[in-house]
Amino acid sequence: MSAQPAHLCFRSFVEALKVDNDLVEINTPIDPNLEAAAITRRVCETNDKAPLFNNLIGMKNGLFRILGAPGSLRKSSADRYGRLARHLALPPTASMREILDKMLSASDMPPIPPTIVPTGPCKENSLDDSEFDLTELPVPLIHKSDGGKYIQTYGMHIVQSPDGTWTNWSIARAMVHDKNHLTGLVIPPQHIWQIHQMWKKEGRSDVPWALAFGVPPAAIMASSMPIPDGVTEAGYVGAMTGSSLELVKCDTNDLYVPATSEIVLEGTLSISETGPEGPFGEMHGYIFPGDTHLGAKYKVNRITYRNNAIMPMSSCGRLTDETHTMIGSLAAAEIRKLCQQNDLPITDAFAPFESQVTWVALRVDTEKLRAMKTTSEGFRKRVGDVVFNHKAGYTIHRLVLVGDDIDVYEGKDVLWAFSTRCRPGMDETLFEDVRGFPLIPYMGHGNGPAHRGGKVVSDALMPTEYTTGRNWEAADFNQSYPEDLKQKVLDNWTKMGFSN
């Protein structure tokens, strides 16, 4: 197999990070028990380079190295989203809007089916169920109060509907349970949950399953996106990248995995057995010690892997890691598309990182809004009904409506508009009879039902934006001064002694 581009091969992606000077290779021994995750967490909180741990304590027979923070932010504003851009064959300087447009591009294209190849790098090594013990692998303990060692934070579950018409790729956390089992979170409305329910209804056998780590970066991005039910991600990724993904058949079931995957676990997802799962330090920045529940149980029958394999790891928590840059951002992209499909005048959507991606700010074309002859109350209700009753809005609990003057990709601009234009209560509509996201602390550990309600549309449009247009100017550099004076200030900025 010839060398593949970075967006189609995880190993090439790691090399691309090195070329970008966005990789730190750590060759000294690092303990997977908290130390690797602590370094990665510090990277996420400082937007530093991605760490590649080449010498994990407990490595054996090439299993495995760890790459931390594969989709987190870079320090420089010029290429802040460069790691995500590398997932999609975009320039490292791509904006978030360009990244999300790329992710949405395939929704209007015919899928490009994958190409089945006889073998691939993921078949370079293999272990059957008598040759491995998951508890002896260098699986990271990511937070000190986690309920177990979470092997699955950035891998891709692969399951198929019983009739074979829908193959789903998704990310859902999973931890080591014993020598050949994992337990994980499988909850509605996840696609893996939907397919699990189909197999349970048939009741004939457990769900054939694979978990692939270090998959093509474009594939892991698609796996994070709330694309419509029944859509097979392999074809979506093909359309998005313009090339057919190469897949190989699993050894122990009839599923197919990306040929360049770093590590593949093959087995089954039980339709009857469960096991203790959690707690885990999740995307909203909290862990609740002792908060263990029964989770879905996976049986691992075989492991195949590349030489000197690399396991990607997300050290989830407070800002900013992959759960924010990908889960929140991609939900917002799908919400933008959903609103436009429902003839709502939304031009942009983004989940502000400052909200721990529990909000999505919606930029409204106010000229089209005025043509609708609607009211704030009516518009709030219509937007909330569309978004909160759709899978794309599942993880989002506040929609903030803003005008054309607000850049939704700048959190400080969204917070300014929300704080100064939305009157609490009067300019808001609550939604209590919709599906809620129990992982948000105020849902799962607060007042009220964990799985219902707790959602709101907050209107940060001023009343005149519905009628005659803006009647104010921002008291800022851009709007409070003449163009010639602004240019003079900028031309002389460094000469006056200010930093560039």
Swiss-Prot record:
The entry's keywords: Cytoplasm, Decarboxylase, Flavoprotein, FMN, Lyase, Manganese, Metal-binding
Cofactor(s) for this UniProt protein: Mn(2+); prenylated FMN
Amino-acid positions noted as binding prenylated FMN in the UniProt annotation, renumbered to this chain: 168-173, 190-191, 233, 391
Catalytic reactions on record: (E)-4-coumarate + H(+) = 4-vinylphenol + CO2; (E)-cinnamate + H(+) = styrene + CO2; (E)-ferulate + H(+) = 2-methoxy-4-vinylphenol + CO2
Any Gene Ontology CC annotation: cytoplasm
Secretion signal span: none
Source domain of life: Eukaryota
Subcellular location field: Cytoplasm
Main location: cytoplasm
UniProt cross-references to Gene3D superfamilies, sorted A to Z: 1.20.5.4570, UbiD C-terminal domain-like
The keyword Lipid biosynthesis appears for this protein: no
Enzyme superclass (EC): lyase
Binding-site residues for Mn(2+), renumbered to this chain: 168, 191, 233
EC number: 4.1.1.102
Single GO MF descriptor: carboxy-lyase activity
A GO BP entry: styrene metabolic process
Cofactor, how bound (note): Binds 1 prenylated FMN per subunit.
Active site, UniProt feature: 282
Role summary: Catalyzes the reversible decarboxylation of aromatic carboxylic acids like ferulic acid, p-coumaric acid or cinnamic acid, producing the corresponding vinyl derivatives 4-vinylphenol, 4-vinylguaiacol, and styrene, respectively, which play the role of aroma metabolites.
HAMAP family associated with the record: UbiD_FDC (MF_01983)
NCBIfam families: UbiD family decarboxylase
Subunit-structure text: Homodimer. May form higher order oligomers.
Protein family per UniProt: Belongs to the UbiD family. UbiD-like/FDC subfamily.
Protein name in UniProt: Ferulic acid decarboxylase 1
Organism this protein belongs to: Aspergillus niger (strain ATCC MYA-4892 / CBS 513.88 / FGSC A1513)
